[in-house]
Amino acid sequence: MKDKIVTFGEIMLRLSPENNARFTQCNAFEAVYGGGEANTAVSLANFDVDANYVTKLPKHIIGQAAINSLRQYGVGVDHIVRGGDQIGIYFLEKKTSQRPTNVIYNRAGSAFALATADDFNWDEIFDCATWFHFSGITPAISDEMTNICITACQKAKEKGMTVSCDLNYRSKLWSSEKACEAMSRICQYVDVCIANEDDAIGIFSMNPADANGEEKNAYIARELMKKFPFKMVASVWRTETSITTFKLQSMIYTEGKAYYSKEFFMHILDYIGAGDAYCAGLIYSLINNFDPQKAVEFSNAASCLKHTVSGDYNLVTVDEVMKLAFSDAGNEVQR
Protein backbone atom coordinates (compact mmCIF):
# COMPACT_ATOMS: atom_id res chain seq x y z
CA MET A 1 0.00 0.00 0.00
CA LYS A 2 1.30 3.44 -0.94
CA ASP A 3 1.98 5.70 2.02
CA LYS A 4 -0.41 8.61 2.49
CA ILE A 5 1.11 11.65 4.17
CA VAL A 6 -0.95 14.38 5.85
CA THR A 7 0.58 17.74 6.76
CA PHE A 8 -1.20 20.43 8.79
CA GLY A 9 -0.51 24.13 9.15
CA GLU A 10 -1.07 27.60 7.72
CA ILE A 11 -0.30 28.55 4.14
CA MET A 12 0.34 32.26 3.74
CA LEU A 13 0.84 34.87 1.08
CA ARG A 14 4.52 35.84 1.00
CA LEU A 15 5.31 39.38 -0.15
CA SER A 16 8.94 40.30 -0.87
CA PRO A 17 10.32 43.58 -2.24
CA GLU A 18 11.61 43.09 -5.77
CA ASN A 19 15.36 43.21 -6.49
CA ASN A 20 16.29 42.84 -2.81
CA ALA A 21 14.95 46.31 -2.01
CA ARG A 22 14.15 47.33 1.54
CA PHE A 23 10.57 47.61 2.75
CA THR A 24 10.96 51.38 2.97
CA GLN A 25 11.96 51.80 -0.67
CA CYS A 26 9.99 49.16 -2.59
CA ASN A 27 7.22 50.01 -5.03
CA ALA A 28 6.30 46.42 -5.90
CA PHE A 29 6.18 43.09 -4.09
CA GLU A 30 6.85 39.63 -5.47
CA ALA A 31 3.94 37.44 -4.34
CA VAL A 32 4.15 33.68 -3.75
CA TYR A 33 2.41 31.25 -1.40
CA GLY A 34 4.05 29.12 1.23
CA GLY A 35 4.18 27.88 4.79
CA GLY A 36 6.17 25.18 6.53
CA GLU A 37 3.84 22.22 6.20
CA ALA A 38 2.57 23.31 2.78
CA ASN A 39 6.16 23.47 1.57
CA THR A 40 6.79 19.95 2.86
CA ALA A 41 3.65 18.66 1.13
CA VAL A 42 4.69 20.17 -2.21
CA SER A 43 8.17 18.63 -1.91
CA LEU A 44 6.67 15.22 -1.19
CA ALA A 45 4.25 15.53 -4.11
CA ASN A 46 7.21 16.28 -6.37
CA PHE A 47 8.75 13.05 -5.04
CA ASP A 48 5.59 11.23 -6.28
CA VAL A 49 4.31 10.72 -2.74
CA ASP A 50 0.60 10.85 -1.87
CA ALA A 51 0.85 14.16 0.01
CA ASN A 52 -2.23 15.85 1.48
CA TYR A 53 -2.46 19.26 3.09
CA VAL A 54 -4.93 20.41 5.74
CA THR A 55 -5.57 24.05 6.64
CA LYS A 56 -8.35 26.65 6.67
CA LEU A 57 -8.60 29.36 4.03
CA PRO A 58 -11.16 32.04 3.18
CA LYS A 59 -13.62 31.39 0.36
CA HIS A 60 -12.52 34.41 -1.68
CA ILE A 61 -10.25 34.33 -4.72
CA ILE A 62 -7.00 34.76 -2.76
CA GLY A 63 -7.82 31.70 -0.70
CA GLN A 64 -8.52 29.84 -3.94
CA ALA A 65 -5.23 31.01 -5.41
CA ALA A 66 -3.41 29.51 -2.42
CA ILE A 67 -5.20 26.20 -3.00
CA ASN A 68 -4.34 26.34 -6.71
CA SER A 69 -0.66 26.80 -5.84
CA LEU A 70 -0.80 23.44 -4.04
CA ARG A 71 -3.02 21.62 -6.51
CA GLN A 72 -0.79 22.42 -9.48
CA TYR A 73 1.97 20.28 -7.93
CA GLY A 74 -0.31 17.36 -7.09
CA VAL A 75 -0.94 18.01 -3.39
CA GLY A 76 -4.24 16.65 -2.09
CA VAL A 77 -6.49 19.53 -0.98
CA ASP A 78 -9.77 17.72 -0.29
CA HIS A 79 -9.65 18.44 3.44
CA ILE A 80 -8.87 22.16 3.26
CA VAL A 81 -11.63 23.94 5.17
CA ARG A 82 -13.08 27.12 3.65
CA GLY A 83 -14.24 30.03 5.80
CA GLY A 84 -13.12 33.21 7.52
CA ASP A 85 -12.14 36.49 5.92
CA GLN A 86 -8.35 36.73 5.74
CA ILE A 87 -5.34 34.76 4.59
CA GLY A 88 -2.18 35.05 6.66
CA ILE A 89 0.51 37.26 5.12
CA TYR A 90 4.20 37.56 5.81
CA PHE A 91 6.52 40.22 4.48
CA LEU A 92 10.05 39.02 3.69
CA GLU A 93 13.04 41.29 3.26
CA LYS A 94 15.72 38.93 1.95
CA LYS A 95 19.21 38.67 3.37
CA THR A 96 21.72 40.48 1.20
CA SER A 97 25.43 40.51 2.03
CA GLN A 98 25.74 41.60 5.68
CA ARG A 99 22.09 42.70 5.89
CA PRO A 100 20.05 40.00 7.67
CA THR A 101 16.68 38.63 6.69
CA ASN A 102 13.71 40.51 8.13
CA VAL A 103 10.27 38.89 8.47
CA ILE A 104 7.10 40.70 9.51
CA TYR A 105 3.99 38.59 10.16
CA ASN A 106 0.45 39.76 9.46
CA ARG A 107 -1.47 36.63 10.43
CA ALA A 108 -3.54 37.61 13.48
CA GLY A 109 -7.19 37.16 12.61
CA SER A 110 -6.51 34.91 9.62
CA ALA A 111 -8.93 32.11 8.79
CA PHE A 112 -6.47 29.57 10.18
CA ALA A 113 -5.66 31.57 13.32
CA LEU A 114 -9.39 31.68 14.14
CA ALA A 115 -10.03 28.02 13.29
CA THR A 116 -11.65 25.83 15.94
CA ALA A 117 -11.54 22.14 16.74
CA ASP A 118 -14.91 21.65 15.03
CA ASP A 119 -13.35 22.60 11.68
CA PHE A 120 -11.29 19.41 11.45
CA ASN A 121 -12.68 15.87 11.34
CA TRP A 122 -9.52 13.87 11.99
CA ASP A 123 -11.20 10.51 11.46
CA GLU A 124 -12.00 11.54 7.90
CA ILE A 125 -8.72 13.38 7.34
CA PHE A 126 -6.64 10.40 8.47
CA ASP A 127 -8.61 7.79 6.52
CA CYS A 128 -5.97 5.41 5.07
CA ALA A 129 -3.18 7.82 6.14
CA THR A 130 0.15 6.49 7.41
CA TRP A 131 2.06 9.65 8.43
CA PHE A 132 1.16 12.97 10.07
CA HIS A 133 3.54 15.94 9.92
CA PHE A 134 3.35 19.44 11.38
CA SER A 135 5.69 22.05 12.81
CA GLY A 136 6.00 24.00 16.03
CA ILE A 137 4.77 27.07 14.18
CA THR A 138 1.23 25.66 14.06
CA PRO A 139 0.55 25.32 17.81
CA ALA A 140 2.20 28.73 18.31
CA ILE A 141 -0.65 30.42 16.45
CA SER A 142 -3.20 30.14 19.28
CA ASP A 143 -4.12 28.16 22.39
CA GLU A 144 -6.93 26.60 20.38
CA MET A 145 -4.46 25.50 17.72
CA THR A 146 -2.23 23.93 20.38
CA ASN A 147 -5.17 21.82 21.49
CA ILE A 148 -6.08 20.99 17.89
CA CYS A 149 -2.54 19.73 17.30
CA ILE A 150 -2.72 17.55 20.40
CA THR A 151 -6.07 16.11 19.28
CA ALA A 152 -4.66 15.39 15.82
CA CYS A 153 -1.60 13.67 17.30
CA GLN A 154 -3.75 11.56 19.59
CA LYS A 155 -5.96 10.46 16.70
CA ALA A 156 -2.91 9.71 14.54
CA LYS A 157 -1.44 7.49 17.25
CA GLU A 158 -4.78 5.71 17.68
CA LYS A 159 -4.64 4.86 13.99
CA GLY A 160 -1.05 3.60 14.20
CA MET A 161 0.39 6.45 12.15
CA THR A 162 3.90 7.85 12.41
CA VAL A 163 3.98 11.42 13.73
CA SER A 164 6.76 13.87 12.85
CA CYS A 165 7.29 17.42 14.05
CA ASP A 166 9.76 20.12 13.05
CA LEU A 167 10.09 22.14 16.28
CA ASN A 168 10.78 25.32 14.28
CA TYR A 169 10.80 27.81 17.19
CA ARG A 170 9.75 31.35 16.26
CA SER A 171 10.28 33.93 18.99
CA LYS A 172 7.98 36.39 17.16
CA LEU A 173 5.07 33.97 17.65
CA TRP A 174 5.44 32.91 21.29
CA SER A 175 7.68 33.07 24.34
CA SER A 176 10.10 30.35 25.39
CA GLU A 177 7.96 29.61 28.42
CA LYS A 178 4.76 29.16 26.44
CA ALA A 179 6.53 27.16 23.75
CA CYS A 180 8.04 24.82 26.35
CA GLU A 181 4.68 24.20 28.02
CA ALA A 182 2.87 23.48 24.74
CA MET A 183 5.58 21.50 22.98
CA SER A 184 6.24 19.37 26.07
CA ARG A 185 2.63 18.20 25.82
CA ILE A 186 2.74 17.69 22.06
CA CYS A 187 6.10 15.91 21.90
CA GLN A 188 4.74 12.99 23.93
CA TYR A 189 3.08 11.84 20.69
CA VAL A 190 5.97 12.48 18.28
CA ASP A 191 8.05 9.68 16.74
CA VAL A 192 10.39 11.71 14.52
CA CYS A 193 11.59 15.13 15.72
CA ILE A 194 13.43 17.65 13.59
CA ALA A 195 15.23 20.18 15.78
CA ASN A 196 18.29 22.40 15.61
CA GLU A 197 20.31 24.20 18.25
CA ASP A 198 18.08 27.29 18.20
CA ASP A 199 14.98 25.15 18.78
CA ALA A 200 16.55 23.33 21.72
CA ILE A 201 17.65 26.57 23.34
CA GLY A 202 14.51 28.57 22.54
CA ILE A 203 11.96 25.95 23.58
CA PHE A 204 13.65 23.72 26.14
CA SER A 205 16.43 26.03 27.44
CA MET A 206 19.10 23.46 26.64
CA ASN A 207 22.71 24.58 26.82
CA PRO A 208 24.99 23.01 24.18
CA ALA A 209 27.94 24.13 26.32
CA ASP A 210 27.04 21.21 28.61
CA ALA A 211 28.01 18.72 25.89
CA ASN A 212 31.45 18.04 27.46
CA GLY A 213 33.16 17.57 24.11
CA GLU A 214 30.31 15.68 22.46
CA GLU A 215 29.26 17.17 19.12
CA LYS A 216 26.51 19.61 20.07
CA ASN A 217 23.82 18.36 17.68
CA ALA A 218 24.27 14.79 18.88
CA TYR A 219 24.16 16.04 22.47
CA ILE A 220 20.92 17.92 21.84
CA ALA A 221 19.37 14.90 20.15
CA ARG A 222 20.36 12.58 22.98
CA GLU A 223 18.96 14.96 25.60
CA LEU A 224 15.69 15.35 23.69
CA MET A 225 15.34 11.58 23.50
CA LYS A 226 15.72 11.41 27.27
CA LYS A 227 12.77 13.79 27.68
CA PHE A 228 10.44 12.41 25.01
CA PRO A 229 9.70 9.06 23.34
CA PHE A 230 11.29 10.05 20.02
CA LYS A 231 12.55 7.22 17.83
CA MET A 232 14.67 9.62 15.83
CA VAL A 233 15.93 13.20 16.05
CA ALA A 234 17.23 14.93 12.93
CA SER A 235 18.96 18.28 12.59
CA VAL A 236 20.17 20.42 9.70
CA TRP A 237 22.33 23.51 10.05
CA ARG A 238 23.73 26.19 7.78
CA THR A 239 27.03 27.92 8.57
CA GLU A 240 28.17 31.15 6.93
CA THR A 241 31.68 30.66 5.54
CA SER A 242 31.92 34.07 3.86
CA ILE A 243 29.62 36.94 2.95
CA THR A 244 28.37 35.01 -0.09
CA THR A 245 28.94 31.31 0.70
CA PHE A 246 27.45 28.89 3.20
CA LYS A 247 28.05 25.34 4.39
CA LEU A 248 25.16 22.92 4.88
CA GLN A 249 25.27 19.71 6.89
CA SER A 250 22.81 17.54 8.79
CA MET A 251 22.59 14.70 11.28
CA ILE A 252 20.24 11.87 12.17
CA TYR A 253 20.37 10.42 15.68
CA THR A 254 18.68 7.08 16.24
CA GLU A 255 19.24 4.00 18.39
CA GLY A 256 22.03 5.74 20.27
CA LYS A 257 24.13 6.65 17.22
CA ALA A 258 24.64 9.85 15.22
CA TYR A 259 24.90 9.77 11.43
CA TYR A 260 26.32 12.83 9.62
CA SER A 261 25.87 13.89 6.02
CA LYS A 262 28.61 15.22 3.83
CA GLU A 263 28.95 19.00 3.65
CA PHE A 264 27.72 21.16 0.79
CA PHE A 265 29.24 24.57 0.10
CA MET A 266 26.78 26.79 -1.70
CA HIS A 267 25.57 30.19 -2.78
CA ILE A 268 21.98 30.97 -1.83
CA LEU A 269 19.21 32.11 -4.15
CA ASP A 270 16.38 31.61 -1.62
CA TYR A 271 16.72 29.75 1.65
CA ILE A 272 13.08 30.03 2.79
CA GLY A 273 11.65 26.52 2.90
CA ALA A 274 15.02 24.75 3.11
CA GLY A 275 14.14 23.21 6.47
CA ASP A 276 10.77 22.10 5.09
CA ALA A 277 12.56 20.52 2.14
CA TYR A 278 14.74 18.66 4.64
CA CYS A 279 11.63 17.36 6.40
CA ALA A 280 10.25 16.12 3.08
CA GLY A 281 13.53 14.41 2.29
CA LEU A 282 13.53 12.73 5.68
CA ILE A 283 9.91 11.55 5.39
CA TYR A 284 10.59 10.22 1.89
CA SER A 285 13.67 8.40 3.13
CA LEU A 286 11.89 6.77 6.05
CA ILE A 287 8.79 5.62 4.15
CA ASN A 288 11.17 4.05 1.62
CA ASN A 289 13.18 2.30 4.34
CA PHE A 290 16.49 4.06 3.69
CA ASP A 291 19.15 3.23 6.26
CA PRO A 292 20.12 6.20 8.50
CA GLN A 293 23.22 7.15 6.49
CA LYS A 294 21.37 7.11 3.18
CA ALA A 295 18.48 9.01 4.78
CA VAL A 296 20.67 11.80 6.12
CA GLU A 297 22.46 12.19 2.77
CA PHE A 298 19.20 12.32 0.82
CA SER A 299 17.54 14.77 3.23
CA ASN A 300 20.57 17.06 3.26
CA ALA A 301 20.75 17.09 -0.54
CA ALA A 302 17.04 17.94 -0.76
CA SER A 303 17.60 20.89 1.56
CA CYS A 304 20.66 21.99 -0.40
CA LEU A 305 18.75 22.07 -3.67
CA LYS A 306 16.00 24.22 -2.13
CA HIS A 307 18.56 27.01 -1.75
CA THR A 308 18.68 27.15 -5.57
CA VAL A 309 14.90 27.48 -6.07
CA SER A 310 13.08 30.80 -5.76
CA GLY A 311 9.94 30.86 -3.61
CA ASP A 312 8.91 28.64 -0.71
CA TYR A 313 8.42 25.40 -2.64
CA ASN A 314 11.24 22.95 -3.42
CA LEU A 315 10.52 22.05 -7.04
CA VAL A 316 13.00 19.21 -7.48
CA THR A 317 12.68 15.50 -8.23
CA VAL A 318 13.90 12.38 -6.46
CA ASP A 319 16.35 11.80 -9.31
CA GLU A 320 17.88 15.26 -8.89
CA VAL A 321 18.25 14.76 -5.14
CA MET A 322 19.76 11.30 -5.59
CA LYS A 323 22.32 12.59 -8.08
CA LEU A 324 23.43 15.37 -5.76
CA ALA A 325 23.48 13.14 -2.68
CA PHE A 326 25.30 10.15 -4.11
CA SER A 327 27.31 11.34 -7.11
CA ASP A 328 29.09 14.37 -8.53
CA ALA A 329 26.35 14.88 -11.11
CA GLY A 330 25.40 18.22 -9.61
CA ASN A 331 28.60 19.66 -11.08
CA GLU A 332 27.81 18.49 -14.61
CA VAL A 333 25.55 19.71 -17.41
CA GLN A 334 22.48 17.44 -17.56
CA ARG A 335 21.96 16.50 -21.25
Task: State where each predicted segment sits.
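Short pre-catalytic strand/loop immediately N-terminal to key active-site residues, enriched for Gly-Thr
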Residues: 24-34, 259-273
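Beta-barrel outer-membrane channel/assembly domains of diderm bacteria
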Residues: 11-17, 39-46
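Conserved N-terminal subdomain of the carbohydrate kinase-like
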Residues: 50-137, 321-335
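Conserved phosphate/ATP/ADP-binding segment of small-molecule kinases
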Residues: 173-255
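Conserved post-catalytic alpha-helical subdomain immediately downstream of the catalytic base
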Residues: 262-328
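Positively charged, low-complexity intrinsically disordered leader regions
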Residues: 1-22
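Alpha-helix C-terminal capping segments
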Residues: 40-50, 285-288
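A short helix->loop->beta-strand "cap" motif at the edges of active sites that frequently abuts
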Residues: 157-162, 228-231
